[in-house]
Amino acid sequence: MIKQALISVSDKTGIVDFAKSLSDLGVKLLSTGGTAKLLADAGLPVTEVADYTGFPEMLDGRVKTLHPKVHGGILARRDLPEHMQALEQHGIPTIDLLVVNLYPFVATIAKDDCTLADAIENIDIGGPTMLRSAAKNHRDVTVVVDPADYAVVLDEMKANGNTVGYPTNFRLATKVFAHTAQYDGAITNYLTSLTDELKHASRSTYPATLNLAFDKVQDLRYGENPHQSAAFYRDLATPAGALANYRQLQGKELSYNNIADSDAAWECVKTFDAPACVIIKHANPCGVAVGNDSADAYAKAFQTDPTSAFGGIIAFNREVDEAAAQAVAKQFVEVLIAPSFSDAAKQVFAAKQNVRLLEIALGDGHNAFDLKRVGGGLLVQSLDSRNVQPSELRVVTKRQPTAKEMDDLLFAWRVAKYVKSNAIVFCGNGMTLGVGAGQMSRVDSARIASIKAQNAGLTLAGSAVASDAFFPFRDGLDVVVAAGATCVIQPGGSMRDDEVIAAADEHGIAMVLTGVRHFRH
């Protein structure tokens, strides 16, 4: 039974109401510093920890709760007579509920003007110590680190005579250990990122010790293949607009491949300003287009490669209305992603309950790192978020691209970044016309992209081509020109750039260099 609670929080969200409810249930309240003042100002009967222990706070508040009367009351096992006798001998009442959250270390180091001294002062000592003590003794002590759990604890106390059951205590304890591990991980990441200057502004992006924190969203039926097990985890620092923030409106559970492909589709589609649609198959775009609205963009994207679009993942950067829903519903689709779905669109898919509808709020946030596991290690890099501006482009041929060609080139370049290397993308009039992906030689990607367009009945005459990396030889360029391309955008940087540029002049086409490569493996 909970008779006494110690409350000490930095995040004071909901704490007054929670403490009042505890007091109404007859629970004695202990508290520290600002939390104690807040509760007292709210008219609640609260005892300062310094008065409780008979030992004043000291060292500018660094020592408040590090006292046997606090930790003895938390750690004592109620089922061991010798523990209870020790408490009685030393006049230590039990502390049955601990409500603590920690100094805002992560928020502090996120400030541009943070100093090492600021960071150090926001490393909580007493809080984690109490949390770990209570979590260790969770059989007898209820410990709350998250304001979202206040209601859960109160409901259970009211239903069970001020008692919280073991399953809840165990869950709350595991939450504490996860929280303190993440807290210590953030401290380690920060301190080991400091260079010899020990200055906040000059710290390394890549700390000497890297701690990552993820919470499990769900177990998956299987991994990339049925013989592989899998689960999906969410980054605790998930940025706005990221796939992990999805809300599923209907459909079967997402699979491993659904989630991987959905991420590829969503990351691509949200880079466009105009209404856009992206169709993904095996993490590669098989159709991308912008249009007047979602329905128009979908019709153009689907036209690129109707065969590959079967069973694909489709993403929009605008609301899916009834017209777009009716168009998509004619095809077999695994997942449909959009910022929102109109009520009429939801009705269209109500008859197709296997279709997974995901809503994700648009946002330009990105993961802090791009991660790839290798045997016994982890490759960590910044995201490929570089968008080339028109002013950075360099025309290297005798012929300049027309304004329309430049628009097509920029569209093609944006798409090519999301195609597996080696990537060749034909585009025109705001849509992809042929996509060649994942080939070991660039010339083969060019041939495949051309064949894809032919199979879809699309002409490549006057089209624009993007290559994610330089042309090592002129053969790839010859293929795209023979297919009908009149302009090409590529990074440049090959030892044979002059030969490739000369070939472009020979063909009378325009070539633009970006100076930026977009390998994708």
Curated annotation (Swiss-Prot):
One of its GO terms (cellular component) is cytosol. Its EC number is 2.1.2.3, 3.5.4.10. Pfam families: AICARFT_IMPCHas (PF01808), MGS (PF02142). One of its GO terms (biological process) is 'de novo' IMP biosynthetic process. Belongs to the PurH family. Keywords: Hydrolase, Multifunctional enzyme, Purine biosynthesis, Transferase. PANTHER family: BIFUNCTIONAL PURINE BIOSYNTHESIS PROTEIN ATIC, BIFUNCTIONAL PURINE BIOSYNTHESIS PROTEIN PURH. Pathway: Purine metabolism; IMP biosynthesis via de novo pathway; 5-formamido-1-(5-phospho-D-ribosyl)imidazole-4-carboxamide from 5-amino-1-(5-phospho-D-ribosyl)imidazole-4-carboxamide (10-formyl THF route): step 1/1; Purine metabolism; IMP biosynthesis via de novo pathway; IMP from 5-formamido-1-(5-phospho-D-ribosyl)imidazole-4-carboxamide: step 1/1. GO terms for molecular function: IMP cyclohydrolase activity; phosphoribosylaminoimidazolecarboxamide formyltransferase activity. Residues 1-145 form the MGS-like domain. The IMP cyclohydrolase activity resides in the N-terminal region. It catalyses: (6R)-10-formyltetrahydrofolate + 5-amino-1-(5-phospho-beta-D-ribosyl)imidazole-4-carboxamide = 5-formamido-1-(5-phospho-D-ribosyl)imidazole-4-carboxamide + (6S)-5,6,7,8-tetrahydrofolate; IMP + H2O = 5-formamido-1-(5-phospho-D-ribosyl)imidazole-4-carboxamide. NCBIfam families: PRK00881.1, purH. This is Bifunctional purine biosynthesis protein PurH. Gene3D superfamilies: 3.40.140.20, Methylglyoxal synthase-like domain (3.40.50.1380). The keyword Transferase applies. The lineage of its organism: Bacteria, Pseudomonadati, Pseudomonadota, Betaproteobacteria, Burkholderiales. The gene is purH.
